[in-house]
């Protein structure tokens, strides 16, 4: 339990003891304490006096006074109590309790903020999963940044997380990729008789793949058409995935599993789920096609599994894939999908219900669109290539840190304008610069302290920390673990980015309000330990969203 929860629990226990001591109730109702909207009204407040009115048969202000008179303020860490309005009790805490967070942060280091106890739940988080047919773009970048941050947050909150990328390597788009490579392969060999397919891929990368294969494997030209296309499918996916993996690694995004759609066919899992759904009575034949009764489970219409020409829809392997996720022992399935996948939510949930799996175990987040902005105007095409701007170009333009930070600043269900000019600014107007500068500034102060012979120590007299800005800063440090818990519970990576901004802001305010290194050696030691706790917290929070914490800027 974190220090904030401990203090709240202690306060509730002491209020209950006070009610008991005052003889106000035999059975004490649920005591709720809240943080007042206005900090002038204390650190916490409760309406318990009004709740007790009918039980105690007394005026609520009178009840409130009885609670105050019988409260052990020392145990409750309370220095002042006010009774307001009809009977609200406002508590002002003795904030020395907050200094306990300093040695805790120093001792835990890079584990500070992490929950000690395992949730005992396995989470499979699938994100990015872009088709291996071209470069990653801004939508994929947002998916990668949010997905990786969410995986870090859930891990810190005590979940067992598996990060997975689903490789769509079995559909028509891969056939088109193979045909496109075939055209470029023969062109490189001087044979222009192979035309590009109607839905082919015309990127420079396909030309390069064709040239490379013509140089390294010219013997492919002698294969039968079937064998040649099979080889181009395999090699095309390998080339594209190698490129995607490289870009994602550079974007500080990593996966535990790369799950191939083709493996579902090879292992017979497609036929397995088809037979199972048929056996359970959820499929039927109509218009020469095979349908799934998803309307039985709140979908707006039934869905086709096998088209009247005998080919599978995309939905069928998706069902097999999600059933495979469940079979692997995952308790929670989280999918991060692009904005064009909104219609998939109900049908995927319905498909799980056909197997008797609670569809609430599947959580789908839709990533809304991102617009790249420069000088107030949307930038749709690369000046260099004339094509859509790639993740690699974004990394080259603004850097990994800025891209990761900006893309996790907003809730994924909201549209976002990515200001590339702001992301490059070395000023405190740039959110990521502002946050990283706070860390670098602390490192600079710690270096000065060390030069003066003052080392960071967890054991110090912290009673000298009385400045209001210092107390507010410590409250923010103490709020790190609850913020991680909240971000994990709501699957909201942007809560961590917002926290980082607040923590950096509180540090800068403290720095501007009070000198860290003073003539008072004890006070200086306490300050040095405190800002080290802030530095650890900042570094851990930045790492959670995949951003570095530089020691100098």
From Swiss-Prot:
One Gene Ontology CC term in the entry: cytoplasm
InterPro entries: aa-tRNA-synth_I_CS, Arg-tRNA-ligase, Arg-tRNA-synth_N, Arg-tRNA-synth_N_sf, ArgRS_core, DALR_anticod-bd, Rossmann-like_a/b/a_fold, tRNAsynth_Ia_anticodon-bd
One Pfam family this sequence matches: Arg_tRNA_synt_N
One of the GO BP terms on file: arginyl-tRNA aminoacylation
Keywords: Aminoacyl-tRNA synthetase, ATP-binding, Cytoplasm, Ligase, Nucleotide-binding, Protein biosynthesis
GO molecular function, one term: arginine-tRNA ligase activity
Localization per record: Cytoplasm
Reaction(s) catalysed by this chain's protein: tRNA(Arg) + L-arginine + ATP = L-arginyl-tRNA(Arg) + AMP + diphosphate
Placement of sequence motif 'HIGH' region: 130-140
Principal EC category: ligase
EC number: 6.1.1.19
Subunit structure: Monomer.
Record family assignment: Belongs to the class-I aminoacyl-tRNA synthetase family.
The protein, known as: Arginine--tRNA ligase
